[in-house]
A protein has these predicted regions:
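Hydrophobic alpha-helical transmembrane segments of membrane proteins
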Residues: 1-76, 87-252
Length: 252
């Protein structure tokens, strides 16, 4: 499975390089604006980082889905399913690499954001006092350790939620491409399947939340324990269903 993961990791190498170069340019531009005291330069680079973060995280997530669609569509890419490896190994490698890819890009943006934040505090010294006051207020309300734990918890829940979205995308593609392999409408069917599956998952979540409201008690966090448990279960269920369908339709 390690070789399969390396193979899948290489498929998105170009995208990662573009993101890394773009981030480096934005951060250097921002820090350059700090050094020469150019507010416009700092503002433009910060805006590009902010807007780009939404696009990049979204694209890097769906790119793995597009690659899976290509692997099931073109004859050359379809050959990966004819290797001696089991469908479970191939699909597992794709899932793991997709998750690692998202985490990698997320980590890059966190590092870039921290560098810009430190540079901004150096440039506007008095602003540091404002952030210190805000931080102290949060600490007084929840305690320093709890504040850090809440931030980590919320970020992890967001990561799990986005992972579930990508996995549902995988399932939608597998459903369309295994049933309508040679159909020109398979792409459109996969989009419809994605929204239908997502709608069903969210409906079930809402029903559970109404029946068991206590599982959604989140304290000072945005996400409750029920949210995390539910979507982890969904991720596992979607993987098993995707693997079962692929094994039935693609194994040789």
């Amino acid at each position: 499975m390690g070789k399969l993961m390396k193979y899948e990791w290489k498929k998105q190498r170009t995208s990662r390089m573009i993101v890394m170069v773009a981030l480096a340019v934005c951060v250097l531009t921002f820090l350059g604006g700090v050094m020469v005291e150019k507010d416009a330069l700092m503002g433009v680079s910060a805006m590009l980082l902010l807007v780009g973060s939404f696009f990049v995280v979204f694209y890097m997530g769906i790119e793995s889905i597009l690659i899976l669609n290509r692997d099931l569509k073109t004859k050359q890419s379809y050959m990966i399913w004819m290797t001696p490896k089991s469908v479970w190994e191939i699909l597992g490698a794709k899932f793991v690499v997709a998750i690692v890819q998202m985490f990698f890009v997320f980590a890059l943006y966190v590092i870039a954001g921290l560098l810009c934040f430190v540079g901004m505090l150096q440039y506007v010294g008095e602003l540091g006092n404002v952030f210190a006051i805000i931080r102290d207020s949060f600490i007084q309300l929840s305690g320093e350790g709890q504040l850090i734990a809440q931030i980590i918890w919320n970020l992890f829940c967001i990561f799990v939620g986005w992972t579930e979205v990508v996995m549902v995308g995988y399932l939608a593609v597998i459903v369309s491409r295994t049933i309508l392999r040679d159909s020109k409408y398979a792409g459109g069917i996969s989009i419809v399947a994605f929204f239908v599956i997502t709608f069903i998952i969210e409906k079930i979540y809402n029903l559970i939340s109404n029946v068991l409201p206590n599982v959604e008690v989140a304290g000072n966090s945005f996400f409750g324990v029920g949210y995390l448990v539910y979507y982890i279960i969904i991720c596992v269920a979607v993987f098993l269903l995707s693997g079962w369908m692929a094994d039935k339709k693609l194994s040789v």
